[in-house]
Amino acid sequence: MSTSSCSFKDRRVSILCCKFCKQVLSSRGMKAVLLADTEIDLFSTDIPPTNAVDFIGRCYFTEICKCKLKDIACLKCGNIVGYHVIVPCCSCLLSCNNGHFWMFHSQAVYGINRLDSTGVNFLLWGNLPEVEENTDEDMLDISAEECIR
């Protein structure tokens, strides 16, 4: 991944939830834009969501680039919430990107900004460990108080 010339460490970390059923899909979300069309907002994550989504349908390619994609659906309600980049194309790999291969449509998910350990400041991607001690499974039982924040 070509991330050396661009930095994502100051981006906020979000909890990603399904808009249709409120299911937590990931605790490591980042607001992003589509590489092939920067007018399209989305969310992404670097770690495969655990017990929250599954593949649906067949692999496909877009007209804009040659990435091989497969849709993902929420396990709770069955709605398509995004896609996984199965095989990224050279053009996207060479672009300024965050290295994430799990993408979520902004029409299908919403993000809740996470707070750091002080509980006062937003958690930034640069302060997030590569592999967190808390897994996404732990985040599935998110409290109502956390969702309200």
UniProtKB/Swiss-Prot annotation:
Keywords: Cytoplasm, Mitochondrion. Signal peptide: none annotated. It is found in: Cytoplasm; Mitochondrion. The keyword Repeat does not apply. Expressed at high levels in stomach and also in kidney and, at low levels, in heart (at protein level). In the stomach, highly expressed in foveolar cells, parietal cells and chief cells (at protein level). In kidney, expressed in endothelial cells, mesangial and epithelial cells (parietal and visceral epithelium) around glomerulus (at protein level). Pfam families: YPEH2ZP. The keyword Mitochondrion applies. One of its GO terms (cellular component) is mitochondrion. Its main location: cytoplasm. Transmembrane segments: none annotated. It comes from the Eukaryota. Belongs to the FAM72 family. Interacts with UNG. May play a role in the regulation of cellular reactive oxygen species metabolism. May participate in cell growth regulation. This is Protein FAM72A. It comes from Bos taurus.
